[in-house]
Amino acid sequence: MSGHSFGGWTTLKTLENDDRIRAILPLAPAGGANGDDEDPLSSALTFDWCQKVPALYIVSDLDSILPLSGMHDLHQRNPEPKIVVILENADHFHFNDDVEANQDSFKQFMEAATADADEDTKRGMDAMLSLMKPSSELVPGTHAYNLINGLGLSHFDANLRDNKDAATFLESDLRSVMAARGITISLMT
Protein backbone atom coordinates (compact mmCIF):
# COMPACT_ATOMS: atom_id res chain seq x y z
CA MET A 1 0.00 0.00 0.00
CA SER A 2 1.25 3.48 -0.76
CA GLY A 3 0.11 7.06 -0.42
CA HIS A 4 1.43 10.61 -0.43
CA SER A 5 0.89 13.23 2.28
CA PHE A 6 -2.54 12.54 3.82
CA GLY A 7 -2.55 9.35 1.73
CA GLY A 8 0.68 8.38 3.50
CA TRP A 9 -1.04 8.94 6.83
CA THR A 10 -3.97 6.76 5.76
CA THR A 11 -1.47 4.08 4.75
CA LEU A 12 -0.01 4.10 8.27
CA LYS A 13 -3.43 4.28 9.95
CA THR A 14 -4.89 1.43 7.86
CA LEU A 15 -2.34 -0.99 9.34
CA GLU A 16 -4.00 -0.66 12.74
CA ASN A 17 -7.16 -2.35 11.43
CA ASP A 18 -6.30 -4.28 8.28
CA ASP A 19 -4.12 -7.39 8.29
CA ARG A 20 -4.11 -7.76 4.50
CA ILE A 21 -1.35 -5.17 4.01
CA ARG A 22 2.09 -6.80 3.70
CA ALA A 23 4.33 -3.85 2.72
CA ILE A 24 3.97 -0.06 2.72
CA LEU A 25 5.49 2.87 0.85
CA PRO A 26 4.47 6.14 2.53
CA LEU A 27 5.62 9.20 0.53
CA ALA A 28 6.14 12.31 2.68
CA PRO A 29 3.32 11.17 4.98
CA ALA A 30 1.37 13.39 7.36
CA GLY A 31 1.19 12.46 11.03
CA GLY A 32 4.65 13.25 12.33
CA ALA A 33 4.81 15.43 15.44
CA ASN A 34 6.48 18.80 14.92
CA GLY A 35 7.73 20.47 18.07
CA ASP A 36 5.11 21.59 20.54
CA ASP A 37 2.22 21.85 18.11
CA GLU A 38 -0.67 19.54 18.93
CA ASP A 39 -1.47 17.51 15.83
CA PRO A 40 -4.54 15.26 15.76
CA LEU A 41 -3.09 13.24 12.87
CA SER A 42 0.01 12.47 14.91
CA SER A 43 -1.87 11.51 18.05
CA ALA A 44 -4.23 9.31 16.02
CA LEU A 45 -1.37 7.07 14.88
CA THR A 46 -0.70 4.33 17.42
CA PHE A 47 1.62 2.14 15.33
CA ASP A 48 -0.13 -0.78 17.04
CA TRP A 49 -0.40 -2.72 13.81
CA CYS A 50 -2.15 -6.03 13.19
CA GLN A 51 1.15 -7.56 12.08
CA LYS A 52 4.77 -6.70 11.29
CA VAL A 53 4.83 -4.77 8.00
CA PRO A 54 8.03 -3.65 6.21
CA ALA A 55 7.99 0.11 5.58
CA LEU A 56 9.93 2.14 3.03
CA TYR A 57 9.39 5.85 3.50
CA ILE A 58 10.55 8.26 0.80
CA VAL A 59 10.60 11.86 2.02
CA SER A 60 12.21 15.17 1.09
CA ASP A 61 14.72 17.22 3.04
CA LEU A 62 13.11 20.60 2.29
CA ASP A 63 9.45 19.65 2.75
CA SER A 64 7.76 22.97 3.48
CA ILE A 65 4.36 21.41 4.24
CA LEU A 66 5.33 18.35 6.30
CA PRO A 67 8.84 19.14 7.60
CA LEU A 68 11.59 16.60 8.07
CA SER A 69 11.25 16.85 11.87
CA GLY A 70 7.85 15.15 11.51
CA MET A 71 9.44 12.41 9.42
CA HIS A 72 11.97 11.83 12.21
CA ASP A 73 9.07 11.41 14.64
CA LEU A 74 7.38 8.86 12.34
CA HIS A 75 10.69 7.02 11.91
CA GLN A 76 11.15 6.75 15.67
CA ARG A 77 7.60 5.50 16.23
CA ASN A 78 7.42 3.10 13.27
CA PRO A 79 8.28 -0.50 14.24
CA GLU A 80 11.01 -2.40 12.41
CA PRO A 81 11.62 -3.25 9.64
CA LYS A 82 11.79 0.24 8.18
CA ILE A 83 13.90 2.33 5.84
CA VAL A 84 13.58 6.09 5.43
CA VAL A 85 15.13 7.53 2.28
CA ILE A 86 15.47 11.31 2.07
CA LEU A 87 15.60 12.90 -1.37
CA GLU A 88 17.93 15.87 -1.07
CA ASN A 89 17.00 19.36 -2.33
CA ALA A 90 13.37 18.35 -2.80
CA ASP A 91 10.03 19.59 -1.45
CA HIS A 92 6.64 18.09 -0.69
CA PHE A 93 5.38 18.14 -4.27
CA HIS A 94 8.24 15.98 -5.55
CA PHE A 95 5.97 13.01 -4.95
CA ASN A 96 3.24 14.29 -7.32
CA ASP A 97 2.94 14.15 -11.07
CA ASP A 98 4.15 17.29 -12.86
CA VAL A 99 6.33 18.29 -9.91
CA GLU A 100 7.51 21.61 -11.26
CA ALA A 101 4.04 22.92 -12.12
CA ASN A 102 2.57 21.74 -8.80
CA GLN A 103 5.40 23.25 -6.77
CA ASP A 104 5.11 26.67 -8.36
CA SER A 105 1.33 26.86 -8.72
CA PHE A 106 0.64 25.75 -5.12
CA LYS A 107 2.53 28.73 -3.74
CA GLN A 108 0.73 31.15 -6.05
CA PHE A 109 -2.65 29.59 -5.28
CA MET A 110 -2.17 29.68 -1.50
CA GLU A 111 -1.00 33.29 -1.57
CA ALA A 112 -4.16 34.26 -3.46
CA ALA A 113 -6.44 32.02 -1.38
CA THR A 114 -5.30 33.55 1.91
CA ALA A 115 -5.19 37.18 0.75
CA ASP A 116 -8.37 37.98 2.69
CA ALA A 117 -7.74 35.60 5.59
CA ASP A 118 -7.36 36.65 9.22
CA GLU A 119 -3.90 37.70 10.40
CA ASP A 120 -3.11 34.42 12.22
CA THR A 121 -3.95 32.38 9.12
CA LYS A 122 -1.89 34.70 6.92
CA ARG A 123 1.06 34.54 9.32
CA GLY A 124 0.97 30.73 9.42
CA MET A 125 0.64 30.43 5.66
CA ASP A 126 3.36 33.01 5.03
CA ALA A 127 5.70 31.09 7.34
CA MET A 128 5.12 27.87 5.41
CA LEU A 129 5.32 29.50 1.98
CA SER A 130 8.54 31.32 2.91
CA LEU A 131 10.22 27.91 3.09
CA MET A 132 8.97 26.88 -0.34
CA LYS A 133 11.59 27.32 -3.06
CA PRO A 134 10.65 27.70 -6.71
CA SER A 135 11.00 24.46 -8.65
CA SER A 136 13.95 25.90 -10.58
CA GLU A 137 16.00 25.79 -7.35
CA LEU A 138 15.15 22.15 -6.55
CA VAL A 139 16.10 18.82 -8.09
CA PRO A 140 14.12 17.85 -11.17
CA GLY A 141 10.92 15.89 -10.64
CA THR A 142 12.45 13.02 -12.60
CA HIS A 143 14.77 12.35 -9.65
CA ALA A 144 11.79 11.66 -7.40
CA TYR A 145 10.00 9.71 -10.11
CA ASN A 146 13.01 7.44 -10.67
CA LEU A 147 13.63 7.05 -6.94
CA ILE A 148 10.02 6.10 -6.19
CA ASN A 149 9.81 3.69 -9.10
CA GLY A 150 13.18 2.04 -8.49
CA LEU A 151 13.12 1.75 -4.71
CA GLY A 152 9.36 1.28 -4.51
CA LEU A 153 9.39 -1.60 -6.96
CA SER A 154 12.35 -3.18 -5.17
CA HIS A 155 10.59 -2.80 -1.81
CA PHE A 156 7.39 -4.43 -3.03
CA ASP A 157 9.23 -7.17 -4.95
CA ALA A 158 11.37 -7.98 -1.91
CA ASN A 159 8.43 -8.11 0.49
CA LEU A 160 5.51 -9.29 -1.62
CA ARG A 161 7.29 -11.62 -4.02
CA ASP A 162 10.18 -12.71 -1.81
CA ASN A 163 12.57 -11.56 -4.54
CA LYS A 164 16.05 -12.05 -3.08
CA ASP A 165 17.73 -9.77 -5.65
CA ALA A 166 15.39 -6.93 -4.69
CA ALA A 167 16.05 -7.55 -0.98
CA THR A 168 19.80 -7.55 -1.59
CA PHE A 169 19.50 -4.31 -3.54
CA LEU A 170 17.65 -2.63 -0.66
CA GLU A 171 20.40 -3.74 1.72
CA SER A 172 23.13 -2.31 -0.54
CA ASP A 173 24.72 1.13 -0.32
CA LEU A 174 21.69 3.00 -1.66
CA ARG A 175 23.42 6.37 -1.42
CA SER A 176 26.14 5.24 -3.83
CA VAL A 177 23.71 3.45 -6.12
CA MET A 178 21.53 6.55 -6.42
CA ALA A 179 24.54 8.87 -6.71
CA ALA A 180 25.68 6.85 -9.73
CA ARG A 181 22.32 7.79 -11.26
CA GLY A 182 22.73 11.47 -10.38
CA ILE A 183 20.24 11.32 -7.48
CA THR A 184 21.36 12.54 -4.06
CA ILE A 185 19.77 10.85 -1.07
CA SER A 186 20.49 10.26 2.58
CA LEU A 187 19.14 7.64 4.94
CA MET A 188 17.51 8.37 8.26
CA THR A 189 19.08 6.51 11.16
Residue ranges and their predicted role:
Residues 7-10, 70, 148, 152:
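Stable alpha-helical elements in mature extracytoplasmic
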Residues 8-18:
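Short glycine-enriched nucleophile-adjacent loop
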Residues 17, 70, 98-102:
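Residue-level detector of alpha-helical segments with a strong bias toward transmembrane helices
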Residues 80, 89, 97-189:
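Alpha/beta-hydrolase-fold serine-hydrolase catalytic core, especially in secreted/extracellular enzymes
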Residues 3-5:
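Conserved alpha/beta-hydrolase "nucleophile elbow" surrounding the catalytic nucleophile
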Residues 7, 64, 166:
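Short, electropositive, low-hydrophobicity segments enriched in small/polar residues
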Residues 12-13, 70-74, 170-174:
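Intrinsically disordered, low-complexity boundary segments flanking structured domains
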Residues 22-95:
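The feature captures the conserved acid-bearing segment of alpha/beta-hydrolase catalytic domains
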